Amino acid sequence: MRYFIIFISLIISSFFILSLTNKLAAEEEWTIDKFRTLSFARVSGEQTHGDNLNFWITARDNCEKIYNTFTVYTYERPGDFKQLLNKNIPIKLNGVDITASVQDIAPFLMGYRVHLSLGSYPIKEYVYFLKEFYDEFQKYEIEIVDGIDFKAAKYFDITTNNWKLDKLVPSVLEASKLCKTINHLDS
């Protein structure tokens, strides 16, 4: 009987730990910080946690413009990877066809980390647009897709990721406030 109680206790404890781990993994964690003349808000991907969705704000732009970028990690290592630098590649954002500009490709761990840009925009208008966009779809999903003379699978082993943006507005507002302290200190 004693072993049975210990066995049941272990099973219940295991389920509790697993449910707690799943709850923690599902949390939307934002990093808000500053570096030199810029501040940023960043959230990790749900499919690939190391893929980040970034919102950069620079003091150089009087903290009024936001640069929206994302990173993708891939194990693929084609010999012509660097030819994608400064090129636009096709993506789908919640199913909508757009492009992203490849800003950087750097060796990372056993593959490459690719940094892509979605552009720069006035902060307030863009962040509220994104919030409405996210609220409408209840997701923010980017899929790298095939295009003219471009096969996504050649360069990316995982072509889709999504991010939670429930805390987008307060996170970017905090990053914007940080940017203004940089601007104030530099003037």
Ranges and model annotations:
Residues M1-A26:
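Classical Sec-dependent N-terminal signal peptides that target proteins to the secretory pathway
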Residues K23-S187:
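A generic "folded-domain core" signal
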